[in-house]
Amino acid sequence: MVQEELSLFRITTGYFFLLWYIIILVAAYSGFFEILFNFRNRPILHTKQQANHQNDPESDDEEIYEGVTIIRPIKGIDPELTSCLESSFCQNYPRSKLQILFCVDDPNDPSIPIIQKLIAKYPTVDAQILTSESYNSQTKTSDDHYGPNPKVNNLAKGFVHAKYDILWVMDSNVWASSNILKNSVISLNGNLNMSRKMGQSRPVKLVHHVPLALSINNTTRSDDFIGGQDLEITAMTPVPSSESLNSQLVKRKSSPKSNNSLNVHPGFTYSKFSKKLGAELDEMFLHTSHSKFYVSLNNLAVAPCVNGKSNIYRRSDLDQSVRLIPHKDSPFFKDPKVKQDAGYYTSLGVGHAIKFFARYIGEDNMIGIALWENTQGRTGLTGDVVVQPYSGSENNAVKDYIQRRVRWLRVRKYMVLLATLIEPTTESIICGIYGTYAISTVFFGTWFNKYWFVMHMLIWMLTDYVQYHTLINHTLDVKNITYLPNWLNESIPPKQRNCLQWGYIWILRELLALPIWIIAMIGHEIDWRGRPFRIKKDLTAEEM
């Protein structure tokens, strides 16, 4: 009786959506369990040489580890800029093998005094500021202009001046714990992904780290300097961790408890709440939906999935990947002008290949594709995260969150169209709707079993809750690190929210996912740092 009521269309669509439902759940939960088991604590990787020579670790480090150049492009002052930049100086890595280049376009950029203080504070580290040539303060342009992407234009001088082949390109607004560089070099040279050995058919050529954002208590520019001064007093008094004789933990002044969390207090106003809600939505997105699929897709390795917040690769590999573009057929680099420019920039010498990517807004994705296609490489994770602090001062209202998501979805629409088109099916509500339809049709002979949908949403929400707090606790973990800034402590807003407050932000994030995607799909203009762009058919960007 039930089977007679089901049309061929219902049966076909039911099985189709059931298959897709299973695929999405497998992808989601493979990422979830990877995070649950391997992101619980900060990882510490060791080479075979270290394991055999633990009595003299510093001497071994000098011999084992290659030199690394850290390149940090900077424009203006972001929240907690001092501590984010200082994390580069505090890497648990031989200082004789470290170079830090701060790339600044404007010689009068307000960030320069902060950088100068850090360089003076760490005189044994090879660090310098590189500014663009012939910068015009009226037009805000310089001779270092190779395309519409201002980040790549700024980075280019760092690639040319780097004295080491291994490069760590890291945005100025993210903080990294002190073992990330060591873990990454071991992973890059050891062909490791999540500490697991990969096959030689597609070795690890780019190491990246899961990007997170944290909604923190309001700070001012002076607070940023104060944080650095506090650390200057205490950073030289490390204490050994209970977990490792080779690890150190910086003592620090405890931060005062904030009154700006979501807890309602006498000074609470809607404007304060709404101004910070965008930061909390970003935090929720990156700690839940984005991170689980980011980790899952990286492990699946069917295509590069790279966020450019923190990437480590060899300059020689990037040069080689661009050098081969004119000689290979690729749907991403097929335009004759693109091939011509690839040949031109690589002919200029070592390090100039990065200039080729200034034509793309999503340079991180295109670098990943070039390394994937032309060096037969893949990406690898270390089990580390990098954290971008968001204050509640400005540019963090709901509309700002929506604009950020729309902007990058539009970029991805042109870079990876298929993945962008199916993205809504990975969100909890849409996934629950077609999944419930499939389960109801195939197993219950009904249109929509509401009990299954409710169960689906509750399990998904519980999964995200566990994953969210696993990553939060990872970020706050004080074991085996040498530097933890004042804004990373138990009084941060994520640790102060109760379940209802967390659930409110989670529900709002899930409800906004589909409208944001629709807005991104029907529009073409991309607003980036106040400048409008459009993406052309060859994936390059054009300033409007």
UniProtKB/Swiss-Prot annotation:
The gene is HSX11. Disruption phenotype: Results in complete loss of glucosylceramides (GluCers) in mutant cells. Has a decreased hyphal growth rate and increased susceptibility to SDS and fluconazole, suggesting defects in the cell membrane structure. Shows increased resistance to plant defensin RsAFP2, and to heliomicin, a defensin-like peptide from the insect Heliothis virescens. Pfam families: Glyco_transf_21. The active site is at 364 (proton acceptor). It is an enzyme of class 2 (transferase). Its EC number is 2.4.1.80. It is found in: Golgi apparatus membrane. Keywords: Glycosyltransferase, Golgi apparatus, Lipid metabolism, Membrane, Sphingolipid metabolism, Transferase, Transmembrane, Transmembrane helix. One of its GO terms (cellular component) is Golgi membrane. GO terms for molecular function: ceramide glucosyltransferase activity. It catalyses: an N-acylsphing-4-enine + UDP-alpha-D-glucose = a beta-D-glucosyl-(1<->1')-N-acylsphing-4-enine + UDP + H(+). Belongs to the glycosyltransferase 2 family. Gene3D superfamilies: Spore Coat Polysaccharide Biosynthesis Protein SpsA, Chain A. It comes from Candida albicans (strain SC5314 / ATCC MYA-2876). One of its GO terms (biological process) is filamentous growth. The chain crosses the membrane at residues 16-36, 428-448, 452-472, 502-522. A motif (D3) lies at residue 364. This is Ceramide glucosyltransferase. Residues 37-427, 473-501 are cytoplasmic. A motif (D2) lies at residue 171. It is a multi-pass membrane protein. InterPro entries: Ceramide_glucosylTrfase (IPR025993), Nucleotide-diphossugar_trans (IPR029044). Catalyzes the final step in the biosynthesis of the membrane lipid glucosylceramide (GluCer), the transfer of glucose to ceramide. Glucosylceramides play important roles in growth, differentiation and pathogenicity. The D1, D2, D3, (Q/R)XXRW motif is a critical part of the GCS active site, involved in catalysis and UDP-sugar binding. A motif (D1) lies at residue 109. Residues 1-15, 449-451, 523-544 are lumenal. A motif ((Q/R)XXRW) lies at residues 404-408. Pathway: Lipid metabolism; sphingolipid metabolism.
